[in-house]
Structures are given as structure tokens and as C-alpha cells.
Amino acid sequence: VNVDVTHRLLVRIAAVAACVLPIVASSAGPAAAAPALGPGGAPAIVVPAGVTAAVAVYDRSTGTFTEQRDTALQVRAASVVKLLIALDYLWNLGPDYTVPAADRTRFDAMLRGSDDAAASAFWSRGGGAAIVTRMVGRLGLVNTAPPPAGYPGYWGYVALSAADTVTIYRYILDSAPARVRTLIMDNLRAATRCASDRYEQYFGIPEAFTKPWAIKQGWSGFGTPPPTVCGAVAAAGAADASASAAAIDLTSGALHSTGTVGAGDRAIVVVFTLHPAGTSLVTARNALTAVTRSLRVPGAAAAAPSLWVGTWGSGVRVRTGPDTATAPVGTVPTGGDVRVDCQRRGAEVVAGGYRNDWWAHLPEFGGYMTNIYVRTPGNTIPGVPEC
């Protein structure tokens, strides 16, 4: 097996497996269970223990909400606030809303790749917190506020609620000038898997539902997580810094998925989640996607289930089939996180005293890696179906 894992690392992993593996196993998320029922007999929203979730799903066809949970709760918006930054920038460009070429590059990067430098440029040009004040008045937002005192430059610390986020999307889709709607929604539909800071941003809505969808994601408070197929994540910036107590929670990990799902942008979906400080990004991703999958979203088609898992070792090959004799198609980032959509038996691999004939399928690579190098308590990954 061409995995280039040192003997020292294997011995260390074996020695601490008893205490490490039960901990990392929890990152796979809750095991499947019969759905609980909420008021009126409808399936309840799934919220893993320890997670704070604010949720809203709005059906544009009927003008009604199909899901609501803590919709007035103020959370730090992280990159979801880029919707307000974009709207404020476009507000005075009418009547044709032509964006200068240099600004268009920044504008597209801010929405497609969640580029922080672009957002900071527009934030500064627009007067910082004044952007939020203007947009609150223009859209009639009721639970949105500028960053707390002492953090004027931290646009990611803007307070936003699920209800107000639905209002923002409803304005873009139903009331904004057609050119404004096109400029924003075309970018959200073209959101890239890898953000500008190399976060993998296809969590929540993109993991839970098949296209068509359009997304604006947000993340803050996870430091520098393990690498993914997108590479090593850049250091935290202005949207993600340490903070003391404030009117909103600035210390918990924040992971949000917002956007539209279905033909004609039928459903507006907003899922804000907060996670205890120290929660790994892989655990938070699985929790957020579990919440999103449990929602009643009109016009949506469920995507195949998948989970994020941690790995160990270096030089771990991904192959075309579950066998070391098949051709390699890539290499897992050293100690990185990977998404697994199914697992199957294949050729047995023996390494460092471990034996395992189970292989995990990694959809982003289009191939299989041996489960030996997946952080899981046994030969198989809990919660992942067989291929």
C-alpha cells in the first residue's frame, strides 16, 4: 500500500486509539433513528445535542412557512452578511445597475467564493456599520444590528436572524430590480465548492439537496481546520477573530447555510447553527447538514446521504476501485477531512498491525480510500451506507 505512513505514527495511533477513537467517532453525527414528531404530528426538526439552531423555510409558491424554529434569535451572521453588503453597494447604481469592471471582479468573488478581502473593501467603502443601518431601514429588518461596540471593522459580527434572512431573500427575489436580482442570484447559483480562503463550503443545503439551489454560506470560530479537497485553509481574518462577551454570541463556532432550493427558487431555506467552543469543523458540518436534511422543503429533492470524517496518516491514496491494484486518482490531504457517501468491502489492506477490507467512497475524488486511515472506532464508518 503506497501510504507513506511512518512506523512511529502507527505505534502512536495504536497506543492512543482507545481514548481517541470514541471521541472522533462522534464527528460522524447522530445515528439514523425514527423521526420525532413535532406539533401537529409533523416530523420535528433534528437538532443534535449541544447545537443551537435557528431555522426558517419559506415556500414562495404558497407564501407560507413550512419550518420555523427560533426565527427571531440573533446570531452573528459571519459571511451571510455579504448579502446586505452586496445590496447596499448596488442600491445607488440604478437605473441600469452597471457594475464597474474592477468592482465586478470583487463583487462576484464576494458572493461566489465568499471572499473576505472583497467584503472588507465594500464594507469600508460603504461606511461599515452604516451599511447595516441603511439596509435595516430599507428592508424593514427587525432583528438585524451592526457589530457590537468595540468591533466596528468586524462585518462578520453583524447580528442577523433567520426571519430577517428570509426577508432579505424575499426582497432580492420578489422586489429588487431585475438587474439586481440577476447579479446576486446568478452568483449564488454559481457558488464554488472551494471558498477563497479554501474552506469547503458545500455543507448544509448543497449536501442535503440536489440542484437547483443557490447558496450563501457562513462560518466563524473554527480556527484553522484540517485540510480538505480544497487544500489547507487560510488563517482567520476579520470575520473570525477572538472576542469577549457581547450582546450576541461571538465565541461559539458559527456555521450557517442559507439560500434557495428548487425550480424557480421555490423555497427559501435558512439554517443558522452555533456549536460549543472547541467543536471540530467536521462535527459542526455533519450537525448542520443533519438539521438541513430534516427540514420540509417544498420542491426539493434529497441528495444521497454523506458524512464528513477525519483521517490520519500521510500520502494516503484514493483509487478507482476498492483495491490497491487499481489506479490512484488522488491523495488525501495529510490529516485532512473528507466526505464519504458510501462504503464497501474490497481487497484487504494490512498496515501496522491493522487489517481492514472496507473502503470508503470519496465523491470529491471519485474514488476509494481504505478505511484503515479513517478515524472510526471499527472497520466501518457509523452512519454511512454500503455502496
Model-derived segments and spans:
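Secretory targeting and sorting signals
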Residues: 1-34
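Penicillin-recognizing serine hydrolase domain
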Residues: 36-54, 58-62, 127-304
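Flexible glycine/proline-enriched surface loops and loop-helix/loop-strand junctions
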Residues: 67-72, 113-118, 147-153
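Active-site SXXK
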Residues: 74-98, 110, 269
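Short glycine/serine- and small hydrophobic-enriched flexible loop segments
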Residues: 87-95, 167-174, 339
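Conserved catalytic neighborhood of penicillin-recognizing serine enzymes
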Residues: 94-145, 161-162
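SH3-family beta-barrel domains
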Residues: 302-322, 329-334, 344, 379-387
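SH3/SH3-like beta-barrel superfamily modules
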Residues: 330-378
